[in-house]
């Protein structure tokens, strides 16, 4: 009987009909559904991972740190072997990730670097410093700062994102590296004097918080189409830009006299604002590109090989340099959004109606 069973197993193996190994489980933890870009990131990644044969556990944490921690704990309990995490607070996950490391689970920090945890194996993001320099250089060009003098300065205010998001160091840092020389020469002037990261931060990247701060600046500085001159507002991303735009519209600005407002993510409301002349530009980070890159990293980890990496010097999370892959950002504006967003299939024309 034993010989018969052995022969049957051997035959199954020879014909390729032996039972398949269990599929690798991948946990994907996104911060919130309230921002369009995280919905797209999560859905694109889940689609790509499922297509590659993985079991995907996609969770959104409603911008609640305790909820994200609990969701990751549940992923570990269910046997997820690889975690892809876009953190709410980059410094709040050390405890649960210590558990992941003990269980041999590999962690990929997604777009936001997870800080102070040696459980982070890799980081996948866009070149976030370049995002800031793109925004800064756009302002230099559109405000004609290289041909101005301090007798005819351009006037600007500054907004960046949440102080618990490590990325603002790169977004805001890149932009300010470009713009600081013009501020020092007096060619560019911030009337409020609020130019430090702490002064310009927006908790949770909140549209409402950005709108309230912009309204306060408008009141304090008497900005308006018939008031004190305001040429531009630097915004690190679109959710802040939307709040800024709301406040400027409320102050009476129209497409004919709207200050130059920057952004990031090419979210639908911001693209519509660009078309309407109420936002100048937004840095485009194609989530399909990043999702595909993460799938390659997950594949390599699952196969025990080295994931593709193109940066080993930039991102130190407090425990050492995290091997990273940086995708390339570009900017969209009213002149190129059709080729960038519609022709590429990222959006349909109906999405932007």
Please annotate each region the language model reported.
Residues 20-353:
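A residue-level marker of the well-folded mature domains of exported/periplasmic proteins
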Residues 2-10:
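Sec-dependent signal peptide recognition
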Residues 13-17:
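Hydrophobic core
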């Amino acid at each position: 009987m034993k010989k018969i069973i052995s022969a049957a197993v051997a035959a199954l193996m020879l014909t390729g009909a032996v039972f398949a190994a269990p599929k690798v489980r991948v946990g994907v933890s996104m911060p919130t559904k309230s921002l369009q870009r995280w919905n797209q990131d999560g859905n694109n990644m889940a689609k790509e991972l499922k297509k590659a044969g993985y079991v995907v556990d996609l969770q959104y944490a409603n911008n609640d740190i305790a909820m994200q921690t609990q969701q990751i704990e549940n992923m570990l309990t269910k046997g997820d072997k690889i975690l892809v995490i876009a953190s709410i607070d980059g410094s709040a996950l050390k405890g649960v990730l210590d558990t992941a490391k003990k269980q041999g689970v590999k962690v990929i920090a997604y777009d936001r670097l997870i800080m102070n945890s040696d459980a982070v194996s890799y980081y996948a993001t866009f070149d976030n410093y370049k995002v800031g320099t793109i925004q800064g250089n756009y302002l230099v060009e559109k405000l004609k700062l290289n041909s101005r003098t301090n007798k005819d300065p351009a006037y600007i205010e500054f907004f960046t994102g949440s102080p618990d998001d490590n990325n603002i160091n790169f977004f805001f840092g890149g932009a300010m590296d470009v713009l600081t020389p013009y501020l020092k020469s007096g060619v560019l002037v911030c009337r409020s004097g609020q130019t430090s990261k702490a002064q310009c931060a927006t908790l949770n990247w909140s549209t409402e918080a950005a709108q309230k701060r912009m309204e306060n600046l408008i009141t304090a500085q008497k900005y308006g189409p018939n008031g004190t001159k305001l040429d531009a507002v630097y915004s690190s991303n679109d959710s802040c830009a939307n709040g800024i735009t709301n406040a400027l519209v409320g102050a009476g600005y129209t497409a004919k006299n709207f200050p130059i407002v920057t952004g990031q993510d090419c979210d639908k409301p911001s693209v519509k604002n660009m078309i309407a002349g109420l936002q100048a530009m937004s840095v485009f980070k194609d989530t399909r590109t990043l999702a595909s890159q993460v799938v390659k990293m997950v594949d390599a980890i699952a196969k025990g090989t080295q994931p593709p990496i193109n940066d080993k010097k930039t991102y130190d999370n407090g425990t050492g340099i995290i091997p990273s892959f940086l995708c390339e950002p570009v900017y969209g504006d009213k002149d190129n959004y059709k080729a960038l967003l519609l022709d590429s299939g990222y959006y349909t024309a109906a999405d932007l109606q």
